């Protein structure tokens, strides 16, 4: 019989499960720590999604809650960087409070099209500042570096657009 199992995709732990007969043991921490050790060789952070009722198990292993959607999901993270670091970086890019209104757009731009450009130009015309988040995850046909360069070139003429990397937290 299998005592415990777990897997990962990218930097996300998935399908961590422990058999009923082994829940009073350290089986979950053995599986999770093994996966963390593997992932930390190539990533600076590890994420886990779980039910809020089981989030405490991950917190006892050093994970920190990022967000919760009761009663379905809790997102937790572990590693050398955290959402606080990401938020600090965003704050450093914030426009002065006098610049209003502020808008935000999240794009993947796989690839950057005239439709994307129109959307961003329209937002820029209606807002004092537009924060343009480009999804950083590399699951697209075009790699992030290429998409970033296309968005940079396509918005260079818009002085009130602040280009931001989505990091591991922004999805579209």
Task: Enumerate the predicted regions with their spans.
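Conserved beta-strand in the GNAT
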Residues: 1-17
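Short glycine/proline-enriched coil/turn segments at helix->beta-strand junctions
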Residues: 8-12, 41-44, 125-129, 157-159
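A generic "binding-loop/recognition-motif" signal
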Residues: 12, 53-54
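Glycine-/proline-rich flexible loop or hinge segments
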Residues: 13-17, 38, 135-136
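Conserved glycine-rich acetyl-CoA-binding loop
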Residues: 15, 19-30, 56
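Conserved acetyl-CoA-binding loop-helix of GNAT-fold acetyltransferases
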Residues: 24-37, 60, 116-121
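Conserved GNAT acetyl-CoA-binding A-motif
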Residues: 37-53
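Nucleotidyltransferase catalytic core that binds NTPs
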Residues: 50, 58-63, 68-172
């Amino acid at each position: 019989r299998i005592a415990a199992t777990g897997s990962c995709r990218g930097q996300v732990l998935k399908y961590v499960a422990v058999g009923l007969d082994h829940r009073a043991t350290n089986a979950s921490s053995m599986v999770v720590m093994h996966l963390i050790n593997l992932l930390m060789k190539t990533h600076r952070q590890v994420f886990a999604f779980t039910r809020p009722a089981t989030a405490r198990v991950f917190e006892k292993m050093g994970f920190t809650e990022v967000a919760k959607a009761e009663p379905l999901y809790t997102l937790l993270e572990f590693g050398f960087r955290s959402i606080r670091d990401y938020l600090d970086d965003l704050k450093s890019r914030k426009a002065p409070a006098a610049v209003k209104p502020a808008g935000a757009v999240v794009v993947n731009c796989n690839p950057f099209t005239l439709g994307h450009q129109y959307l961003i130009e329209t937002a820029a015309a209606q807002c004092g500042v537009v924060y343009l988040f480009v999804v950083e995850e590399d699951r697209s046909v075009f790699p992030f570096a290429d998409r970033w360069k296309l968005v940079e070139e396509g918005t260079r003429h818009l002085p009130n657009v602040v280009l931001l990397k989505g990091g591991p937290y922004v999805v579209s």
